[in-house]
Swiss-Prot record:
The chain crosses the membrane at residues 42-62, 76-96, 190-210, 219-239, 264-284, 299-319. Belongs to the TMEM184 family. Keywords: Coiled coil, Membrane, Signal, Transmembrane, Transmembrane helix. This is Protein LAZ1 homolog 1. Residues 344-364, 459-484 are annotated as: Disordered. It comes from Arabidopsis thaliana (Mouse-ear cress). It is a multi-pass membrane protein. Pfam families: Solute_trans_a. Residues 406-428 form a coiled coil. GO terms for cellular component: plant-type vacuole membrane.
């Protein structure tokens, strides 16, 4: 019945759009009067996919809220599913109204960072929380062909960075060091994204943002460099985290989830570059392409989000959480996933085996479960508390080394200033030695002795004494002439 209702709604919307377009009352975006006749079918087709991208995720979210048996997992999974309708709505609004394109793009970029954080927290929740995740990492080892058997079974694992990252970043030891590095690397992107979005809005209001203009008097290139480095580091941390836990999370098919999420993030960025390159090379021609040059990216995103909404139904299903209605609530759904359509593996079944006995729900168990309003409240407030704690943790761990670095720089400058003052003080207290005869005046006096030694001659004590007396007499005569 639910699927029939969704299909009927889609058919009704399509029929209304076709009838309105047929009678000429289909509204057109503000691209000019001449372009209106070409934009009826792009807007109509984009609207159909946007409706799909809204209805299917909403249906999936309601399914998760109705079977809200694993709050730690589902609260962030719902935030991840919301990525599709958010992208679809803002792209459609940007396609319709060019004046709202900038604000819509800022919202999309901010939610991208939030979705990246939600995906990481969802994987951690599937591993039964932070403590169990760190314990699992500490049990991992890196075993190669040259590693002795006994040594490999008791040594901790190490995450090695590829070139050129290994030239700047030390290897991470699996455990608290690796977990905190990944956590900070992902949360910092969410924080910087919000800060840069606020700065972009302020600069745009003053007309000095200059989106797409790489000029020193605009703020766009500086914010773009900061965000690109931040995003690259966050995605790198997520990939490293996935590589460590992918075998542990095999029952929930993490590869499909990871590729689905990553494709949405990367496609929206790379396709914009490809479209701009095609237009710059003149490979895309035609009046429709020229009219949609500035909005073709939004149109493509609308189409992609409709497809992604269908994919999410199979990648992030609510069926494993519905099975939790017949067992204790505080048990992870790892074996529920494994029992649906994954071939049973003895080790995985043993590893994901429940510590409590399954049972049918009684009346008291139903009362312990959250109802629909309580589930919504937990998604909003519960996830908000975790986000605030992670942001506070990240800021404290980032600000502390920055403060130490600034303090070290201040001490260095203070030491340099003290040395300069000490040198100036010594220079003032030193006596004036301008009356001293320069050394070049004495050069001729010692040249005779040097020539005598060089010619092989000897200098006796008496000869040296006479020479000294001769030099003293010459010096006294020279001093007398200088005083005159």
């Amino acid at each position: 019945m639910e699927w029939r209702g969704i299909l009927c709604s889609l058919l009704f919307i399509v029929s209304v759009g076709e009838s309105s377009s047929r009678f000429g009352i289909m509204w057109h975006p503000n691209l000019g009067v001449d372009s209106g006749q070409y934009l009826t079918w792009p807007i109509l087709s984009a609207s159909v996919f946007v409706v799909i991208a809204i209805l299917l995720p909403m249906y999936l979210i309601f399914e998760h809220l109705a079977s809200y048996n694993q709050p730690e997992e589902q609260k962030f999974l719902i935030g991840l599913i919301l990525m599709v309708p958010v992208y679809a709505v803002e792209s459609f609004l940007s396609l319709v109204n060019s004046e709202a394109a900038f604000n819509c793009e800022v919202i999309r970029d901010c939610y991208e960072a939030f979705a990246l954080y939600c995906f990481e927290r969802y994987l951690i929740a599937c591993l039964d929380g932070e403590e169990r995740t760190i314990e699992f990492m500490e049990q991992q080892t890196v075993i190669t062909q040259s590693t002795p058997l006994l040594e490999g079974t008791c040594s901790y694992g190490v995450v090695e960075h590829p070139f050129p990252m290994n030239c700047f970043v030390k290897d991470w030891s699996l455990g608290p060091q690796f977990y905190h590095a990944v956590k900070i690397g992902i949360v910092q992107y969410m924080i910087l994204k919000m800060i840069c979005a606020l700065l972009a809005m302020i600069l745009e209001a003053f007309g000095v943002y200059g989106e797409g203009k790489f000029a020193w008097n605009y703020g766009y290139p500086y914010l773009a460099v900061v965000l690109n480095f931040s995003q690259t580091w966050a995605l790198y941390c997520l990939v490293q985290f996935y590589n460590v836990i992918k075998d542990k999370l095999a029952p929930i098919k993490p590869l499909a989830k990871f590729l689905t999420f990553k494709s949405i993030v990367f496609l929206t960025w790379w396709q914009g570059i490809i479209v701009a390159f095609l237009f710059s090379m003149g490979l895309v021609k035609g009046s429709l392409a020229k009219e949609l040059k500035t909005r073709i990216q939004d149109y493509i995103i609308c189409i992609e989000m409709g497809i992604a909404a269908v994919v999410h139904l199979y990648v992030f299903p609510a069926a494993p959480y519905k099975r939790g209605e017949r067992c204790v609530r505080n048990v992870a759904v790892m074996s529920d996933y494994a029992s649906i359509d994954v071939p049973p593996d003895p080790e995985e079944v043993k590893d994901s085996e429940r510590t409590t006995r399954t049972r049918y729900g009684r009346h008291d168990d139903r009362e312990k479960r959250l109802n629909f309003p309580q589930s919504v409240r937990d998604v909003v407030l519960g996830s908000g508390e975790i986000i605030v704690d992670d942001m506070r943790f990240t800021v404290s761990h980032v600000v502390e080394p920055v403060e130490r670095g600034i303090a070290k720089i201040n001490r260095t400058f203070h030491q340099i200033s003290e040395n300069v003052k000490r040198f100036e003080q010594q220079k003032k207290t030193t006596k004036d030695d301008s009356y001293v005869i320069p050394l070049n005046q004495w050069a001729k006096e010692f040249s005779d002795v040097h020539e005598n030694l060089y010619d092989g001659g000897s200098v006796s004590d008496s000869g040296l004494g006479s020479t000294n007396r001769h030099h003293q007499s010459r010096v006294s005569g020279l001093w007398t002439r200088m005083r005159r």
